[in-house]
């Protein structure tokens, strides 16, 4: 038992991944002030009775600017290229207000599903200019009370082959872009594309987060060049690649070799199950490959990995609700994860993506922000197995949502 301390809020009997038995979590000034088996205080109390508390989900890869487009473009887009073309045809007509409204819809779904940190890719090119960027900046400002939103500026349709794209990227980086993305497989000169992006990353001191190796042909890839750039520029721990579905097509020995290379270069991998599964293997007539890279197996080999949302209700992924818990469960199903691997699957949407984004103040520890969510289960394993409700969420100690449990109404 601890002496009485001035807290603003105490969570009683919370289960957390770091403690074997339930603990009390004391919050003061928007931060976690103490964790102990029993805290004495006259503060407001929330009795959790052994429910799981997490420091919120972390979504490392989503596209808020092109979410919720299905009603505008039809549903017949079977390949990556067709999806890119469909969105490119619409971008010229995007307005700041339109991007804001669609992005807000998805952002609110993510918040009530327990996401507290998010990196969104924002397309920057001569078609849309900086309109999407301005809209997402406004979302970052307007929803800061509930979620930390980080902007990764991103030339979807290439860089060296798209006059004016480079200048727009620089303008966005000068105006608040916090990471730089890229898509070398869409550029006529992929190596120059990567060179330019790393130049900009160094010039503006930002992380690199790429779309990479997004097919199932393992005979060629850009992974080697990304690792080389990361090591040559001492950018280890500041580079991530999304999709990387080619890794799913490798035999075991080559998969192991790729993992060693990624770990040595400090290059992280983000797997995007909904999109990767939806778009890969489209040419197969039977025995269709999953096209899903096994992130938890890469983690076992020393690679930092995450599972993320990517797209929501657009040609790349015509469904989605921005729930990272659902995505982690989906990943575990498709990856055929064993029960003993469920905790590792939960790590892919919590602690590991926090490492990928270099979030130094993430986690349930004294001094960190009181960004907490409560799940209707008693363990991390249960979170993956059961898909429990996320009952409530807090940002800097302030409650931002609550979900009422369903009540069964028996007859009589």
Name each region found by the language model.
Residues 1-41, 380:
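N-terminal metal-binding scaffold of metallo-dependent hydrolase/deaminase domains
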Residues 56-67, 122, 207-216:
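Histidine-centered catalytic micro-motifs
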Residues 68-99, 171, 176, 204, ...:
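Active-site gating loops and adjacent loop-to-helix segments of metal-dependent hydrolytic enzymes
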Residues 70-121, 127-142, 167-174:
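Alpha-helical scaffold segments that flank or form the walls of functional sites
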Residues 131-145, 161-268, 285-307, 362:
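Histidine/acidic residue-rich metal-binding segments in metalloenzymes
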Residues 207, 228-239, 275-279, 289-377:
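His/Asp/Glu-enriched, well-ordered alpha-helical/loop segment
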Residues 355, 366-412:
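C-terminal cap of metal-dependent C-N hydrolases
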């Amino acid at each position: 038992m601890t002496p009485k301390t001035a807290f603003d809020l105490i969570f009683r009997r919370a289960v957390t991944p770091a403690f074997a038995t339930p603990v009390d979590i004391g919050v003061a000034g928007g931060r976690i002030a103490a964790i102990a088996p029993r805290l004495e205080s006259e503060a407001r109390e929330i009795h959790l009775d052994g429910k799981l508390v997490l420091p919120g989900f972390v979504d490392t890869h989503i596209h808020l600017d092109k979410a919720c487009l299905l009603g505008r473009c039809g549903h017949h887009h079977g390949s990556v290229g067709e999806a890119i073309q469909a969105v490119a045809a619409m971008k010229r007509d995007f307005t700041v207000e339109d991007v804001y409204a669609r992005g807000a819809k998805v952002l609110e779904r993510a918040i009530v599903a327990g996401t507290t940190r998010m990196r969104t890719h924002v397309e920057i090119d001569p078609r849309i200019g900086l309109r999407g960027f301005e809209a997402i900046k406004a979302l970052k400002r307007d929803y800061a009370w509930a979620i930390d939103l980080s902007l990764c500026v991103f030339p979807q349709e290439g860089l060296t082959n798209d006059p004016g794209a480079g200048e727009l990227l620089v303008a966005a980086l000068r105006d608040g872009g916090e990471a730089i993305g890229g898509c070398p497989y869409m550029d006529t000169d992929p190596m120059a594309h990567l060179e330019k992006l790393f130049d900009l990353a160094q010039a503006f001191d930002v992380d690199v987060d790429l779309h990479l190796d997004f097919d199932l042909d393992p005979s060629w890839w850009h992974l080697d060049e990304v690792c080389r750039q990361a090591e040559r520029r001492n950018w280890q721990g500041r580079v991530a690649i999304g999709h990387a579905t080619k890794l799913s097509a490798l035999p075991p020995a080559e998969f192991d070799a790729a993992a060693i290379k990624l770990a040595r270069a400090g290059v992280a991998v983000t797997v995007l199950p909904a999109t990767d599964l939806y778009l890969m293997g489209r040419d197969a007539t039977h025995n269709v490959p999953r096209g899903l890279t096994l992130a938890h197996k890469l983690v076992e080999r020393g690679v930092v990995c995450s599972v993320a949302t990517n797209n929501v209700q657009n040609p790349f992924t015509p469904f989605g609700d921005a729930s990272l818990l659902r995505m982690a469960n989906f990943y575990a199903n498709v990856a055929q994860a064993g029960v003993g691997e469920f905790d590792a699957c939960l790590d892919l949407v919590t602690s590991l993506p926090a490492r990928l984004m270099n979030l130094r103040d993430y986690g349930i520890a004294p001094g960190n922000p009181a960004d907490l969510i409560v799940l209707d289960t008693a363990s991390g394993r249960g979170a993956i197995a059961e898909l429990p409700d996320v009952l409530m969420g807090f940002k800097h100690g302030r409650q931002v949502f609550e979900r009422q449990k369903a009540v069964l109404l028996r007859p009589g």
